[in-house]
Regions:
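A contiguous loop/helix-start segment that scaffolds small-molecule binding in enzyme catalytic cores
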Residues: 10, 85, 164-236
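Alpha-helix capping/helix-boundary segments
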Residues: 46-48, 93-94, 123, 173, ...
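Glycine-rich, flexible N-terminal cofactor/catalytic loop recognition
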Residues: 2-66
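Glycine/small-residue-rich loop that forms an oxyanion/phosphate-binding "nest" at active or ligand-binding sites
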Residues: 65, 73-122
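Short active-site oxyanion
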Residues: 34-40, 113-116, 164-165
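Conserved helicase motor
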Residues: 63-70, 144-148
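Class I SAM-dependent methyltransferase SAM-binding "motif I" and its flanking Rossmann-like core
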Residues: 103-161
Length: 236
């Protein structure tokens, strides 16, 4: 355990990054921190149970999801105030980034309780780094709205941003999102479609939106996606 963590001498909240696909990517510090927690708050207890079994840690877990976050945040903060060390994880990546966690972190900050990050894998930054698109300036949009009108409104708002746009999309909506991107951003924008990062079927497809939309429609759309869009006029 990091000496700085132990020296706090009180309850605290750990934000612990977990692998985004390949369990071998978990850090030594993350393993130590998970094992030292009194309780782990997680999106899906079944997913976290597999991770804990993989690292050989036996720690109780509690469900912390979008549906119960408003209720659980103050309850967990109460436990931290009583001296417990609680770890917060998402199913994959860093908690509170397009995943539950913001309300618990905010509650801890309001109460002046320590919040300690344990950094690690992040799908958005990984996809950006390998895309070949500009990395000096970027805007993370997270998940776009479910409906086309909402997606188009967000894309229209940021289409002139002078850097790369990073978008998460589910396998159920990615084809529709690509169609909206072509309509709003134009067919010639450069795009990277990152799928199943660090997993067996990892792929990175890079090209113009129009070309990738056509080729994507001819292939299986299974997996988890990060879309990185280059700025207007950028030539790959």
């Amino acid at each position: 355990m990091n000496k700085g963590d132990e020296s706090l001498g009180t309850g605290l909240l750990y934000l612990i990054a977990t692998p985004i696909g390949n369990l071998a990517d978990i850090s030594h510090r993350a393993k130590e921190t998970l094992a030292a927690c009194d309780l782990i708050a997680c999106e899906d207890t079944r997913v976290t149970a597999k991770l804990l079994a993989h690292i050989g840690a036996k720690v109780p877990t509690t469900s912390y999801r979008e549906e119960n976050e408003r209720r659980k945040a103050p309850e967990l903060a109460d436990r931290i105030e009583r001296g417990e060390k609680i770890g917060l994880v998402s199913d994959a990546g860093f908690p509170a980034i397009s995943d539950p966690g913001f309300r618990l972190v905010r509650e801890c900050r309001r109460r002046k309780l320590p919040v300690v990050p344990v950094p690690g894998p992040n799908a958005a930054i990984t996809a950006l780094a390998v895309s070949g698109l500009p990395t000096d300036k970027f805007l993370y949009l997270g998940f776009l709205p479910n409906k086309s009108a909402g997606r188009c409104k967000v894309l229209e708002q940021w289409k002139d941003f002078p850097g790369s746009l990073i978008i998460y999309e589910s396998k159920y909506r990615v084809e529709k999102a690509l169609a909206d991107m072509e309509n709003v951003l134009g067919p010639d924008r450069n795009l990277c479609i990152a799928r199943e990062i660090t997993k067996i079927h990892e792929t990175f497809n890079i090209g113009k939106i129009s070309d990738l939309k056509t080729s994507f429609a001819e292939k299986s759309g299974k997996g988890e996606f990060v879309l990185v869009v280059g700025p207007e006029g950028y030539v790959l």
